[in-house]
Swiss-Prot record:
Its EC number is 5.4.3.8. One of its GO terms (molecular function) is transaminase activity. It is an enzyme of class 5 (isomerase). This is Glutamate-1-semialdehyde 2,1-aminomutase.
Length: 422
């Protein structure tokens, strides 16, 4: 089996055989398929197995694998540019496109990952407000920056540890943890620390404790508290941006953040991130202001070209989001019916083209505490069952399942057929 052979050899040269922990399939537990290629809604491993892909590279591949327009943009650009570390026209084009098609971004700074975007956004908020503390929420994941690894979601959550070794206590002393979807908890924190709170950073749709949409009163309450105390509201839309809607979850909720972080979809499948917001805030970044942030590969021309091709295609085809919502509704309705018919305790949370299946007897999953009660042993069996039937979902109870525009009703039917035989 080439998959197993390649993975075993990978362990000799990469910790755990992977470059990101969840790829090791530790929680399932299986050896992961080693992916060779992808086309449209499908991926193929080194053993020749075909899977309908509902991971979509953890979100970015909303257009499907190897979309022709994105591939052509990469090919065309790479004939003349790989990297300059200098100003290019294509970075202007993508920056301008985002600023003119998004409602709440007046200026933007390109970086190379979601982690870079969120850590830079927090630094900017601290520099702008001249305050130290930030508020984040249990189970919300904002990357592996030390200040965020207090109570994180996803793989950290699965392993049942609150943070990470190697993070000094001093790094997290200014990070205050609140319960997601609990506005009273945040009010109490502001009553105590409001005068030194630089920002709230929040996923409007949480994706790394499973998908948990923020409640409208909760998110609006955060906006109001930030206004009252002079703190900034940072929406981490690394996962939800350009996915739940082109303009992100903030457009669905009608809430205006001060800073928005983006990544995943905006890079068209290449390493990319960005943060943007009000001009008066963004102008605090060097070289205009005192907040220093830099990057050799930031604004890489090939990445910018892939991102521009992706966002133009999404923005110019609003029917894509209509299709994704239709498929999402069908999948959600079908799984709920199977759960009822077979008496399998499940909660299905969905926002647009991202959703999660929680194996729990609770009636809802609204925060980290609820998510932790889910049965990961049953999920591991479910994952193996789905993989054996050619359905590729994330190997963790606490990761999202994603749709892309190349998925069809037939693919949804196959997903539901597999669930029905579990």
């Amino acid at each position: 089996m080439r998959n197993d052979k390649i993975f075993e050899e990978s362990k000799l040269y990469m910790p755990g055989g992977v470059n990101s922990p969840v790829r090791a399939f530790k929680d399932v537990p299986l050896n992961p398929p080693v992916i060779k290629k992808g086309r449209g809604a499908y991926i193929y491993d080194e053993d020749g197995n075909e899977y309908i892909d509902f991971v979509c590279s953890w979100g970015p591949m909303i257009l499907g694998h190897c979309d022709e327009d994105v591939v052509n943009a990469i090919k065309y650009t790479s004939e003349n540019a790989i990297s300059f570390g200098a100003t290019t026209k294509i970075e202007l084009e993508l920056s301008k496109y985002i600023c003119t098609t998004m409602d709440n971004i007046e200026m933007i700074r390109m970086v190379n990952s979601g982690t870079e975007a969120t850590m830079s956004a927090v630094k900017l908020a601290r520099g702008y407000t001249r305050r130290n503390k930030i508020i984040k929420f249990s189970g919300c994941y904002h990357g592996h920056f030390d200040d965020f690894l207090v109570e994180a979601g996803s793989g950290v959550m699965t392993e049942g540890i609150p943070g990470s070794a190697g993070v000094p206590k001093d790094s997290i002393k200014n990070t205050i943890i609140a319960e997601y979807n609990n506005l009273e908890d945040v009010k109490n924190i502001f009553n105590k620390y409001g005068s030194d709170t630089a920002a709230i950073i929040v996923e409007p749709v949480a994706g790394n404790m499973g998908v948990i949409p923020g409640r409208i009163d909760f998110l609006k309450g955060l906006r109001k508290l930030c206004d009252e105390y002079g703190s900034l509201l940072i929406f981490d839309e690394v996962m939800s941006g350009f996915r739940v809607a082109y303009k992100g979850a903030q457009s669905l909720y009608g809430i205006k953040p001060d800073i928005t972080t983006m990544a995943k979809i905006m890079g068209g499948g290449l390493p990319c991130g960005a943060y943007g917001g009000r001009k008066d805030i963004m102008e605090n970044l060097s070289p205009l202001g005192p907040v220093y942030q830099a990057g050799t590969m930031s604004g890489n021309p090939i990445v910018m070209a892939a991102g521009l091709a992706t966002l133009k295609k999404l923005n110019e085809n609003p029917d894509y989001y209509v299709k994704l919502e239709k498929l999402g509704k069908k999948l959600e309705k079908g799984i709920k019916q199977i759960s009822k018919d077979k008496n399998i305790p499940m909660v299905i949370n969905r926002c647009g083209a991202m959703f999660s299946i929680f194996f729990t007897s609770d009636s809802e999953v609204k925060n980290y505490k609820d998510a932790r009660k889910c049965d990961t042993t049953i999920f591991a069996k479910f994952f193996q069952h789905m993989l054996e039937r050619g359905i590729y979902i994330a190997p963790s109870q606490f990761e999202a399942i994603f749709l892309n525009v190349k998925h069809t009703e037939e693919h949804i039917d196959k997903f539901l057929q597999a669930v029905n035989t579990f």
